[in-house]
Design a protein with these regions (language model features):
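Phosphate-binding P-loop
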Residues: 1-6
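Hydrophobic anchor at the beta1->P-loop junction of P-loop NTPases
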Residues: 11
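The conserved Walker
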Residues: 14-15
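Conserved glycine(s) of the Walker
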Residues: 18
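Conserved substrate/cofactor phosphate-moiety recognition/catalytic segment
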Residues: 23-64
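Conserved beta-strand scaffold positions in the cores of enzyme catalytic domains, especially
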Residues: 30-32, 86-90, 113-115
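Glycine-rich phosphate-binding loop used to anchor ATP phosphates in small-molecule kinases
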Residues: 49-99
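Small-molecule kinase domains that catalyze NTP-dependent phosphoryl transfer to phosphate-bearing small molecules
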Residues: 91-133
């Protein structure tokens, strides 16, 4: 991976996969956007396909407005919404969430920079931080 000074980083995966825990640890000294907090700000709790596409666009726009690197953490169930991020981190720690509708719509990524399969990810956080400096 090349040196990146101003990267848009997507941490995505099923609910309960550890996205927020990982993203908060990664986002030290970076802008950080959590989907649940953004939904609260916009009072938008629409989880239909249209609502999820709107949320994906909103999250990407917020990341682009940030100065320097930004970490966004959300399910991002559709592969088409992941392509524009510089670094894509798939939290592939669980095969199913407790939300059956989300399980059905979640598309496995066609490409990701990192695939996290367990909660031992300190080395990946360090690698990303090193590339961003």
């Amino acid at each position: 991976m090349e040196k990146l000074n101003s990267s848009k980083i997507l941490v995505f995966g099923l609910p309960g996969s550890g996205k927020t825990t990982f993203a908060r640890q990664l986002a030290v000294n970076m802008a950080y956007f959590n989907a649940d907090e953004i939904r609260k700000m916009f009072n938008d709790w629409d989880f239909s396909m249209e609502g999820r596409l709107r949320q994906a666009e909103r999250m990407y726009c917020l990341a682009n407005l940030a100065e320097g690197s930004a970490v966004v953490d959300f399910i991002c169930p559709y592969d088409q919404n992941r392509h524009d991020y510089d670094i894509k981190i798939w939290m592939n720690t669980i095969s199913k969430s407790k939300f059956e509708d989300t399980n059905k719509m979640f598309e496995k990524p066609s490409h990701c920079t990192f695939e996290i399969k367990d909660y031992n990810y300190d080395n990946i956080i360090k690698e990303i931080h090193d590339k961003l400096q």
